[in-house]
Amino acid sequence: MSVNSVRHTCVNKILIVGLGSIGKRHIEIIRDLFPEITIGLLRHSKCNEDEIKSYGIKFCFSTIEEALAYQPDAAILANPASFHIDVAIPFADAGVHLLIEKPISNNIDGVRKLISLCSKNGLILMTAYNLRFSPSLNQFRDLLHQGKIGIPYAVHVEAGQYLPNWRPNLDYRQTVSAQEYLGGGVLLELSHEIDYTQWIFGSVKWVKATVLRQSHLEIDVEDTAHLQLGMSNGFNDKQLVVTLNIDFIRHNSTRQCHVIGEKGSLLWNGIQGSIEFFSPNSDEWEVLYSNLTERNYTYEQEIRHFISSIESGSSPHVSGEDGLNVVSVIEAVKKSNVEGSLVYLEQHRV
């Protein structure tokens, strides 16, 4: 989206779509950071007046038509991914700026139409990959692009957590993560890793993947994915392959990226907010950076950036196109898994 195409708007009213854990988080953050903004809610369940008041919500709606009549300046879609596009299109058509929780959708159907509509109407369309606002991940990216370890030769990305422990106050079987029709599964739920991999190393050119449901968890989606990603490589003209492993089954929560380079190795630990450097000269790991921020920090920065982008008319840090590129990779992964072959992505690019 061109910077000049975005119209400037003062954000007075925001609509939150969905009142799950992430919807509640967004409401609390907006209420704390922007108390002057009026918050409305659109949900498929009946509005409970006491519950709504407890979250500081002024208005609650049960239909898109009612929510459109509220005339919000912006909307944050925190409903299941399989419903994102059907909700987003009418709001974009009405001139409402959009922040859509990751993934932007559970497939690419309608995503290009949404991107085009937002561009035509001069709207911000932002995908909510909040890891882009992690101080440690930004520092990690900067160190790589500044040549700390020279040319990257190999990249190993891992993320996983035991699904029943993810939201301990909920029955995991009833969560979005566990249900295919809501857009669950490890590929969509842990798509942060696909996004930041492209943000750091360049776009994915091809994939080779194995996707499994191998645990005894009561889910109807994949719980494990092993990916090989051939990157366009933003560092040089050599082939760079990323191995990416994500799962719902490990009991030791993990989020890390290990890059092997010509001048050493660099390791990002997203759980600890740390970066370590292995130098061939010292033959040991050295902590270069450590900043364990509060969990809400990246979400707060994301909301600040969304509202700032609307009010300044500048393009967002994580665009609708970024969201589409992630879903395109996921669709190629699924195709590779079924066919047992390498799949190229050029035909899916924006």
Locate the predicted segments by residue.
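Contiguous beta-strand/loop segments that form the cofactor/metal-binding neighborhood of enzyme cores
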Residues: L188, I194-S274, E300-S312, V350
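Predominantly a Rossmann-like dinucleotide-binding segment in NAD(P)-dependent oxidoreductases
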Residues: S134-E218, G340
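C-terminal helix-rich "cap/oligomerization" subdomain common to oxidoreductases
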Residues: M1-R7, L41, A74-L77, S232, ...
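Rossmann-fold dehydrogenase core element
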Residues: K113-L131, I151-V155
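Hydrophobic residues in well-ordered beta-strands that form the structural core
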Residues: I100-E101, L125-T127, W268
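Beta-loop-alpha module in the N-terminal Rossmann-like domain of NAD(P)-dependent dehydrogenases
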Residues: Y55-L117
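N-terminal Rossmann-like dinucleotide-binding module
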Residues: M1-Y55
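Active-site loop of classical SDR/Rossmann-like NAD(P)-dependent oxidoreductases
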Residues: C47, N291-R304
